[in-house]
Amino acid sequence: MALIEDLNHFINYFPLVLRLFFLVVFGLYSFTLILHLLVINRVDVFSLLHTPLPVNRSQQANAPLWQLSFSLSILGTLLFVIAESLYLISGSDELAYVPVFIFGVIVFMPVHKFWFFQRKVFTRQCLRILGGSYRPDYKFPDVIFSDLLTSYSRVIADLWLAGAILIYVTDSPNNSHRKQYENEVIMSMIAAYPYAIRFRQCLIERSSADNSSDKFWSTLNSIKYFTAFPAIFLGIFAKKRFSFLWFLWNTSSAINSTYSFWWDVSMDWSLPFFKQPLSIQNWKFGVRRLFPTFTFAVVSAIDFVLRMAWVVRVLPEHQSAFFTTDFGIFIMQFLEVFRRCVWVFFRIEAEASKSLAYVNISDRSDIPTIHPD
């Protein structure tokens, strides 16, 4: 208990808005690293993501997308340090919001500077996805970003709480105001919206499919996202441990996590582990993959553990209570963002293996790609 109190005291040095900002900056660094690792493994990631190709496709330093991601990572780090310094010096978290706001303005500002074209494409992608749609010729990057939003769903919901704290809190920011100002209904609706986006995208994909097989798999994919809704909303009412609603909540979480894990491995990563798990022949890949089977097995195990992180709720009450504290919630959000970053890397790797999107070290191309203008 003393350790938990110490951790909660430590997290109070980082107000909620900075914890959320940290997760955004971490995601940017992770994406930059993903691009780097894919490029050094000869994956034509910039073509897969429909971004302008650099002159030398094997050098990510020339790619505008990599340059923007890396620059935003550095900028985010500097603004985070400034925001934290302002918070520690002033003792008020209002000033900490200013650098975070500046970061958002820089990302979306309609100024022809700082990789304007890439930011414009990203802004239009955000507007398109928030409307629950995607461009058929831009499907892969849209789906990647939409799935990324599902892992940031609780982070996005906490933005509402951060806004409420900014508006209503007048006392010491060192106190946790989560229980006082969080609205579970509103925050659950916000958290569910990214899943609703993917659910609608799957229905659109199903309606436009040309054959029954594509319709079938699109239907199964839509069911995966639909199973997230009970896991989100039942938590509002399942307050009493071992009640019927509590068991129903955990059951729905188990169904969603297991289904999503199977889809991650079998469909998104195109791994054959679940065809006949006891047959070693089915653990061999029929197409080019970047890593040996053991690597994929380890990553799949990590994905399973992180998908099942919700089981902390069934721990003894004195242990599960830690994950309802500010520090515990932050750790769970961080682990989910980390899991999604790993998923993104291997999702792009799987797409490259299916489409043979690899480049030769001497391959040079200045052919532009189509963007959703």
Curated annotation (Swiss-Prot):
Its main location: membrane. One of its GO terms (cellular component) is Golgi membrane. It is found in: Vacuole membrane; Endoplasmic reticulum membrane. It comes from the Eukaryota. GO terms for biological process: protein transport; retrograde vesicle-mediated transport, Golgi to endoplasmic reticulum. Keywords: Endoplasmic reticulum, Membrane, Protein transport, Transmembrane, Transmembrane helix, Transport, Vacuole. InterPro entries: EXS_C (IPR004342). The chain crosses the membrane at residues 20-40, 69-89, 97-117, 149-169, 216-236, 242-262, 291-311. PROSITE patterns: EXS. The keyword Repeat does not apply. It is a multi-pass membrane protein. Pfam families: EXS (PF03124). Residues 178-373 form the EXS domain. Belongs to the ERD1 family. Required for the retention of luminal endoplasmic reticulum proteins, affects glycoprotein processing in the Golgi apparatus. This is Protein ERD1 homolog 1. It comes from Schizosaccharomyces pombe (strain 972 / ATCC 24843) (Fission yeast). The lineage of its organism: Eukaryota, Fungi, Dikarya, Ascomycota, Taphrinomycotina. The gene is erd1.
